[in-house]
């Protein structure tokens, strides 16, 4: 998947959020603005072309305060579907 389509759809606010995703984001203190910024500043680090119902990817980006943020999202070229967003465990690196 091409990051350009994610960034275009993000700039057009064509993002769909599940209740589960929003709940987990709240638990992790991640805002919608953080996710949008992560997509805008990000790069795709893993691609999942066979995911169902839409191809998805892992995006490495930054929240609005410059903290590293990972976003898993799918795309049907009409909307972005946010699957989850989380701060990586930097102790593993």
Spans of features found by a protein language model:
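Ribonuclease/tRNase effector modules and their secretory precursors
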Residues: 1-93
